Amino acid sequence: MDHISKKCSMNAIVGTTNAGKSTLINMLVGQKVAAVTPKVQTTRVRMHAVLNNENVQLIFIDTPGIFSPKTKLEKFIVKHAWMSLKGIENVILLLDVKNYLNKHIEKIISRIKQSNINAILVVNKIDTVPTSSVDKAIEHMYSLHSFSKTFTISALHDIGLSRLVDYLCEISPNGPWLYPEDQISDAPLKFFMAEITREKLFLSLHHELPYSLSVVTEALEEKEDGSLVVKQVIYVTKDSHRTIILGKKGEMIKKISMESRSDLAKILDLKIHLFLFVKVREFWQNHLDECVGYVE
């Protein structure tokens, strides 16, 4: 394909916590590139996901949910969320239709206005409420900002996504692609693999597990038979958290390992040998540069 005919755009997805940003990213790209759990604050750093649609490359920037930061980790997360608005064509405000009165939305819109970037409103989870509630949410959002376009979707059930993609392709400027045709994410392999395990932890320990954990892929080793040995460390802040993750007679950590290994094997098309270790590191959130792989 002649590069002159190619189009490319950067599209940041912003919104409050648990609006469905990672689910939307994964559905658009067609593969799991971001952790998806029912809990808030599961996206921690900016991640670029890539969708190639004929002659158009759409790059989506998966950002953390916006919330009031307290620890160094939380401040790091919020800083990276707003950094995503630099050098992009479009900002997509993803709205949970049942949470349109969230106190943080006006702050987000204020930052969007300051950026002077084309803003698109995408109302998510429309399958969970009547049409009248969707209309009410849209009316409220337009009282705060004049969006260039509005889409109503259910990211989880792939409703309305094709219209959103078609529109983004239509308005993308001419230009060369920024990523190779077969690349769907810019997340380093170790980070990507840690995200898979972190997702399984949150899904399995939905009520017991706090956010004060991190998963780090410490070692990858390719064996002669082509399989991959993966060693990961789960950092927690308390011994009680470690006990929860291990489970009775180690059953929970075995379950997490099996589910993560299965996903990794399917996605990478490799046999995976996964070894998980749980370590207690008090206040690791305030030591980002030492053990948990958060770097700027």
From Swiss-Prot:
Residues 15-22 are annotated as: G1. It comes from the Bacteria. Residues 124-127 are annotated as: G4. GO terms for molecular function: GTP binding; GTPase activity; ribosomal small subunit binding; small ribosomal subunit rRNA binding. GO terms for biological process: ribosomal small subunit assembly. Residues 41-45 are annotated as: G2. Its main location: cytoplasm. One of its GO terms (cellular component) is plasma membrane. GTP binds at residues 15-22, 62-66, 124-127. Residues 153-155 are annotated as: G5. Residues 205-282 form the KH type-2 domain. Residues 62-65 are annotated as: G3. It is a peripheral membrane protein. It is found in: Cytoplasm; Cell inner membrane. Keywords: Cell inner membrane, Cell membrane, Cytoplasm, GTP-binding, Membrane, Nucleotide-binding, Ribosome biogenesis, RNA-binding, rRNA-binding. Pfam families: KH_2, MMR_HSR1. PANTHER family: GTPASE ERA, GTPASE ERA, MITOCHONDRIAL. Belongs to the TRAFAC class TrmE-Era-EngA-EngB-Septin-like GTPase superfamily. Era GTPase family. An essential GTPase that binds both GDP and GTP, with rapid nucleotide exchange. Plays a role in 16S rRNA processing and 30S ribosomal subunit biogenesis and possibly also in cell cycle regulation and energy metabolism. This is GTPase Era.
